[in-house]
Each structure stands twice: as C-alpha cells, then as structure tokens.
Amino acid sequence: WIMGHMVNAIGQIDEFVNLGANSIETDVSFDSNANPEYTYHGIPCDCGRNCKKWENFNDFLKGLRSATTPGDSKYKEKLVLVVFDLKTGSLYDNQANDAGKKLAKNLLQHYWNNGNNGGRAYIVLSIPDLNHYPLIKGFTDTLKQEGHPELLDKLGYDFSGNDAIGDVANACKKAGVSGHVWQSDGITNCLLRGLTRVREAVANRDSGKGYINKVYYWTVDKRASTRDALDAGVDGIMTNYPDVITDVLNEAAYKSKFRVATYDDNPWETFKK
C-alpha cells in the first residue's frame, strides 16, 4: 500500500492517486465537544509541505465518497484504503468514547451513505494515544446500534504513538480489538528514525500469535529509505511522494517480491510468504 501522506483537501485526493497512491492518510481535528471538525494538520508538519490545507470534515467525506464509489464521475478505482489520523490530543481522555460515536455517525451519513452504495474504501482509525482506546468501542457500538454491523468488515485500527509493542497489544485487548490491526511506526520526514521497532512489529505480525496484521512506516520520501523499509518487510509506506515509492517498486530487486495492492487484497489479512 502506497499511502499518500496528509491528504486534507479534496483536490489532493486526485493529485496523490495520480502519482501512484492506492491509499491516503487524512488528518481529523476535533472541536471541544469531541465532534470531528476539519481535515487539517496545521503547523508544524512535514518539511516541504503546506501544512494548512483543509476542508470541513463532512465535506471531505463527501469528496472521498465520490472518489471511492464505482460509477461516480470522480471515481478512482486504485484508491482502496484510507487512514484517518485522529488528532485526539485536543480531547480529554473521558471524551474518547464520544469522539468515536460522533465520528461513526459522520462516516455513516456522509461516507457510507447510510449503507446505500456509499464509498467502498477500507478505513483505518489511527489513534495517537493508547488512553483513547474507548474511541474504538464508541465507533463500533454506534455502527451496530445504527443497524450497520456489516460496515465493521471495512474497519481497521492503528495506535500511532510509537509505544512499546506490548503496550499497544494491551490497548487493543482493552478496546476489544482482535484482528484488522495495522501497526504504524515512524517520524516526520524532517528527522531520521531507525527500523528497530518496525522489525519488532514485523516479527509480531509474522509470529502467527501476535496482534498485528499489517505494518506501515512513515514518512518516507527517499529511494534509499524506501528500499530499507521494503527490506524490513513492511506492508505499507506512507509518503509525500508516491511516485518515488512506485519507482522503487519497479526496480528489479523489488518487482518480483512486491506489487501494489488492489481492492481484492484484504487489508486485514496477514500476508503469508
């Protein structure tokens, strides 16, 4: 999965997919009542990027729905996975469940079209703080209460705080999550980060008894670091330059080992070599 980083304006969806992304990451900010408000990152952000592009959250969802609904004039067949980077740092811990409920209602209405031929992309809820694990239950309970448990098949989970793997496993357990887990690891492109924890996550994924199904690394903009991440065995690479990742995947050393995921590739299944 080539994951376009910080795609917060509707116009950027096309831009990143046209460069080779089959997945995007979108920032979600919340108001003081735990309502998802904007798709917005703000300053500081990655080096070389405009940090200030934004939409109202529900407007972005409608644009995303168009891009992921077959038959729509804006449909992009390649776009199959969306990571919502939930900026819950502005919330109190006791608002996490509420944030999950409100997020679910917004997605249900504006993205999934109340279950009536809505967007088809798989969705990952990415949470930066392990203490905010109740967001997941708020979200999943709401889908069930609203009569759409089938949409849980489209939903995955990530804790993005680079916490110890054992601590993340615990948070998943507390959230009632077993399966559909993407584990992120990374740092802003302005800084360097080694692959120690990525390798640990990959080992957990491949052990057959870990909690992780997929591992992705962020934010990778250079060919050398792309090769290092692929050599470490990641499933996804988040990038500001999808064309760079595409180029590396076309190199002889990687062409036979990796391919770009399509809609038919289940993002919750651990890949067996």
From Swiss-Prot:
Binds 1 Mg(2+) ion per subunit. It is found in: Secreted. GO terms for biological process: killing of cells of another organism; lipid catabolic process. Pfam families: GDPD_2. It comes from the Eukaryota. Keywords: Cytolysis, Dermonecrotic toxin, Disulfide bond, Hemolysis, Lipid degradation, Lipid metabolism, Lyase, Magnesium, Metal-binding, Secreted, Toxin. Disulfide bonds join 45-51, 47-190. GO terms for molecular function: lyase activity; metal ion binding; phosphoric diester hydrolase activity; toxin activity. Belongs to the arthropod phospholipase D family. Class II subfamily. This is Dermonecrotic toxin LspaSicTox-alphaIA1ii. The lineage of its organism: Eukaryota, Metazoa, Ecdysozoa, Arthropoda, Chelicerata.
